[in-house]
Amino acid sequence: MSLGRLCRLLMPALLCGALAAPGLAGTMCASRDDWRCAGSMHEFSAKVLDGHTVNLDKYRGFVCIVTNVASQUGKTEVNYTQLVDLHARYAECGLRFLAFPCNQFGKQEPGSNEEIKEFAAGYNVKFDMFSKICVNGDDAHPLWKWMKIQPKGKGILGNAIKWNFTKFLFDKNGCVVKRYGPMEEPLVLEKDLPHYF
């Protein structure tokens, strides 16, 4: 095989992170159009509630739980209460939470980012809250599209997010290690956490 042909074959892998240095691939491969080639959550970015864009590489070396949230869901009280409790007990161990408000399920997150921030403050939320996004469909945030196709991020009866408070557990390398359905309360995750610290 010629060197030119070898380069043409390897270039897509290099650009999509399979062989690239950590962090470099994220700037090239986690956009709205080419999210499939990301190697970890660290290659994505998202806007926090105040509108600033955050590179998710900041979570490198931390165990993370990513969830979609809503303020007017029947599961809101138990999920927010337990997420805050887990964060208080495990943040010092290296656990981080990324909460993404979403209005796709029963229109149960209708508020503005400022209203969502005020609502979360009522639960004394100290973990990271991101701007409202879509988690399903063509307009879904690239991170959420990517999570759902990971080997351990796939759902039951299809990969679509079924409801509010679907949770994904990530290891320190930014890889999905488990998906939890919306009926599984956050404390269910606690038994799995020690495997990843």
UniProtKB/Swiss-Prot annotation:
Q: How does it assemble?
A: Monomer. Has a tendency to form higher mass oligomers. Interacts with FUNDC1; this interaction promotes GPX4 recruitment into mitochondria through TOM/TIM complex where it is degraded by mitophagy.
**Gene Ontology molecular functions:** glutathione peroxidase activity; phospholipid-hydroperoxide glutathione peroxidase activity
For the modification Phosphoserine, the affected residues are S40
Q: Which family is annotated? A: Belongs to the glutathione peroxidase family.
Q: Any idea what job this protein has?
A: Essential antioxidant peroxidase that directly reduces phospholipid hydroperoxide even if they are incorporated in membranes and lipoproteins. Can also reduce fatty acid hydroperoxide, cholesterol hydroperoxide and thymine hydroperoxide. Plays a key role in protecting cells from oxidative damage by preventing membrane lipid peroxidation. Required to prevent cells from ferroptosis, a non-apoptotic cell death resulting from an iron-dependent accumulation of lipid reactive oxygen species.
Record InterPro entries:
Glutathione_peroxidase (IPR000889), GPX_AS (IPR029759), GPX_CS (IPR029760), Thioredoxin-like_sf (IPR036249)
Q: What does it catalyze?
A: a hydroperoxy polyunsaturated fatty acid + 2 glutathione = a hydroxy polyunsaturated fatty acid + glutathione disulfide + H2O; 2 glutathione + H2O2 = glutathione disulfide + 2 H2O; tert-butyl hydroperoxide + 2 glutathione = tert-butanol + glutathione disulfide + H2O; cumene hydroperoxide + 2 glutathione = 2-phenylpropan-2-ol + glutathione disulfide + H2O
Record-given protein name: Phospholipid hydroperoxide glutathione peroxidase
Q: Name one GO cellular component term.
A: mitochondrion
Which residues does the Swiss-Prot or TrEMBL record annotate as the active site?
U73
Tell me the keywords, alphabetical order: Cytoplasm, Developmental protein, Lipid metabolism, Mitochondrion, Oxidoreductase, Peroxidase, Phosphoprotein, Selenocysteine, Transit peptide
Q: Return the Gene3D superfamilies for the record.
A: Glutaredoxin
Q: E.C. number, please?
A: 1.11.1.12, 1.11.1.9
What is its EC class?
Answer: oxidoreductase
Alphabetically, which GO biological process terms does the record hold?
arachidonate metabolic process; lipoxygenase pathway; negative regulation of ferroptosis; response to oxidative stress; spermatogenesis
